[in-house]
């Protein structure tokens, strides 16, 4: 790359980042250039690139790149060149040879032996002090810079002649959280999101906000203790990339494991993975079919409380659990024919109690397959520096941040609230590590967190358990009292009637025409400052307009009695009716208008999935519905769970089929005020 090309590639954010975090950033296209020729993790490459290429000067970068390539050529051992490497150490006769390799340690008969992966020797002498300093050497191993010497061992008669003189894990020596937080404060939230994505190797300019948030959610297990994440989606979307490549503190398992490996030996002499690593991830979860049931049983307790029983004493760990897997069907097919945990193996899928402990279901089908334009050529943090930041943030707690501005809805039970709080906390650490967040920014995190937990609960509900039926998840603004319901995108649009409550002032209503045709409408009232006038949209006409006018006249005549005189006199009411079936049925919907107006005036939503039937006279007398069977059948088919019915129609309810009665609960009313109170769930 020429100097001119380099200057074109840089943007304002690159310059701002290199100034704020000098020496801790690297150009990500360099990583890909080196990665092509070296089969080492990204954090290893960036350790070297950060050491030799942390500059904005193109000539310095090119010189540093040459040093990195030379270092990898000289010091990185290819698996098929182990004999050459061993011979080189032997020829030095006591002097050390430096190389990069993954080092594991095991205890054999009270003596520690190191195993160097590509050096291909399982009995290398190592000081116990390194084992004490870096206990990950005992489980999974650590990529390190190793100084190796050859020394004839009299006891083994030359059998084990290799000794590690010095071992340096590939990671930064120290991390300053205050410096990191101060640096973060110099950037806007949008800028920081883009920086984190570039650090991961992605180009944010080709992503919308939601896709950015999905990518960032993959980092939560690295930043939040005891966080349980699942992501299922198409192949080649980089599901396990964050765990595998972005941190030396995460372990990725590609097959079944044992209780001893996960949670430690019964004797207590060797710790399990959950006590050693920050994240334990399972790739290709479908391959876990043969995993012992005991592992899931122990994980169930661990995922709930972070504790587990091995031997006589209970033990604890703070590793997060992540599960990644592939979907084999389009998402709409999965939603319509089953549930979203079907790709899981039986040992997990059939354990609803375990699934209920998952904090977030990341919709992997929304993430595109990796393509060239998704990768960045701009600057991001050196990965080992960013990994240390996320690791240091694990000690901090942001779970109470939500309470500054919001409360969670009644359908979120204790486990749901815990999941949402942990997701918000994790996203705070990734995006707002300095703790400064506006109400609008926090609202975005809360909504995103609620959605991911609701996706878990919706699947549990589909699996057929009555205890999970409350899934209308919401959160409320403490200042305004406004309640917002959060859905899951993949389930939208199947029923005309939403399962969540509508905004205050909106209701569903139905009618049956003289020819037996049934109509289904969503009536929406918006209040603005005014003088007590009714303003009807152009689509509202004929019988419907007349019934609305009668209901408004009745409401106006009773405004003082209802305690709403001032609010009605100082407001104008804008009315719109959305024909959900587009069949233009003449509708008498006076009671629905009255309830909608009452809802708007009280700033209180009507109970979810409620249909309001009936009309009224100018004096407030209720008119019965021509027939119940047809509108209730249509209502049931489109997701209605509850119907307000004039008490005059009570005798007709005996004609309604048992199927409808099983799915739609009737609520009878005798006057408009009673209808409004019952619709709003008020006494």
Q: What label would you give each PLM region?
A:
Residues 203-333, 338-342, 356, 474-489:
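Conserved ASCE/P-loop NTPase catalytic core
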Residues 2-200:
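Extended, charged/polar low-complexity intrinsically disordered regions
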Residues 301-317, 344-354, 387-393, 599-600, ...:
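Substrate-engagement module of ASCE P-loop NTPases
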Residues 335-368:
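A short helix-turn-beta junction within AAA+ P-loop NTPase domains corresponding to the substrate/partner-engaging
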Residues 492-683:
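Peripheral, non-AAA+ core regions of ATP-driven protein-machinery
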Residues 227, 277, 317-319, 354-359, ...:
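Short glycine-/polar-rich loops that comprise or flank the Walker A/P-loop
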Residues 179-213, 541-545, 624-627:
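Dynamic helix-loop-helix/coil hinge segments at AAA+ ATPase domain boundaries and subdomain interfaces
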Residues 359-487:
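Conserved NTP phosphate-binding and transfer environment spanning the P-loop NTPase/kinase superfamily
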């Amino acid at each position: 790359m020429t100097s001119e090309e380099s200057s074109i590639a840089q943007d304002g954010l690159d310059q701002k980042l290199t100034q704020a975090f000098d020496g801790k950033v690297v150009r990500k296209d360099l990583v890909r250039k080196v990665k092509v020729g070296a089969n080492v993790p990204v954090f290893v490459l960036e350790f070297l690139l950060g050491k030799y290429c942390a500059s904005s000067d193109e000539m310095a970068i090119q010189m540093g790149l040459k040093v990195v390539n030379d270092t990898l050529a000289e010091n990185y051992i290819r698996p098929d060149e182990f004999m050459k490497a061993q011979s080189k150490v032997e020829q030095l006769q006591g002097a050390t040879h430096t190389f990069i390799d993954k080092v594991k340690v095991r205890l054999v008969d009270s003596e520690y032996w190191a195993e160097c992966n590509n050096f291909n020797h399982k009995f290398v002498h190592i000081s116990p002090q390194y084992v004490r300093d870096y206990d990950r050497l005992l489980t999974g191993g650590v990529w390190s810079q190793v100084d190796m010497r050859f020394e004839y061992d009299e006891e083994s008669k030359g059998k084990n002649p290799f000794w590690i003189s010095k071992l340096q894990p590939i990671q930064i020596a120290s991390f300053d959280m205050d410096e990191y937080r101060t640096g973060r404060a110099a950037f806007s939230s949008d800028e920081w999101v883009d920086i984190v994505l570039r650090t991961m190797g992605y180009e944010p300019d080709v992503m919308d906000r939601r896709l950015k948030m999905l990518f960032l959610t993959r980092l939560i297990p690295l930043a939040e203790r005891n966080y349980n994440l699942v992501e299922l989606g198409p192949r080649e979307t980089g599901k396990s990339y964050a765990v595998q490549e972005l941190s030396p503190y995460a372990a990725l398992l590609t097959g079944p494991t044992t209780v001893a490996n996960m949670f430690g030996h019964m004797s207590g002499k060797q710790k399990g993975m959950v006590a050693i690593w920050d994240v334990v991830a399972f790739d290709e979860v479908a391959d876990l079919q043969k995993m012992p049931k005991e592992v899931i049983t122990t994980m169930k307790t661990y995922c709930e409380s972070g504790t587990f029983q091995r031997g006589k004493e209970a033990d604890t760990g703070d590793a997060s659990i992540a599960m990644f897997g592939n979907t084999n069907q389009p998402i709409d097919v999965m939603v319509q024919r089953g549930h979203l945990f079907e790709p899981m193996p039986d040992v997990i899928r059939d354990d609803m109690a375990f699934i209920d402990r998952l904090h977030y279901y990341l919709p992997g089908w929304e993430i595109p397959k990796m393509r060239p334009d998704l990768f960045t050529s701009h600057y991001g943090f050196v990965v080992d520096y960013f990994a240390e930041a996320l690791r240091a943030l694990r000690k901090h707690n942001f779970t109470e941040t939500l309470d500054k501005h919001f409360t969670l809805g009644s359908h979120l039970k204790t486990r749901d609230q815990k999941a949402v709080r942990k997701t918000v906390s994790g996203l705070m650490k990734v995006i707002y590590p300095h703790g400064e967040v506006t109400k609008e920014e926090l609202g975005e995190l809360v909504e995103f967190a609620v959605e991911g937990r609701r996706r878990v609960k919706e699947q549990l509900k589909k699996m057929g358990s009555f205890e999970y039926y409350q899934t209308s998840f919401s959160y409320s603004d403490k200042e305004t009292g406004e309640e917002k319901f959060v859905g899951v995108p993949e389930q939208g649009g199947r029923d005309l009637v939403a399962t969540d409550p509508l905004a205050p002032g909106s209701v569903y209503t139905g009618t049956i025409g003289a020819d037996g045709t049934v109509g289904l409408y969503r009536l929406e009232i918006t209040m603005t400052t005014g003088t007590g006038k009714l303003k009807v949209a152009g689509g509202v006409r004929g019988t419907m307009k007349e019934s609305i006018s009668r209901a408004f006249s009745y409401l106006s005549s009773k405004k003082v009695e209802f305690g709403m005189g001032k609010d009605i006199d100082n407001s104008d009411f804008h009315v719109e009716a959305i024909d959900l079936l587009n069949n233009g049925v003449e509708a008498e919907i006076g009671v629905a208008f009255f309830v909608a107006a009452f809802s708007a005036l009280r700033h209180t939503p009507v109970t979810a999935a409620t249909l309001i039937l009936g009309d009224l006279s100018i004096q407030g007398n209720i008119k019965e519905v021509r027939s119940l069977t047809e509108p209730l059948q249509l209502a049931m088919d489109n997701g209605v769970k509850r119907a307000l019915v004039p008490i005059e129609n009570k005798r007709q309810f005996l004609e309604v089929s048992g199927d409808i009665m099983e799915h739609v609960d009737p609520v009878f009313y005798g006057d408009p005020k009673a209808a409004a109170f019952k619709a709003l769930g008020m006494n």
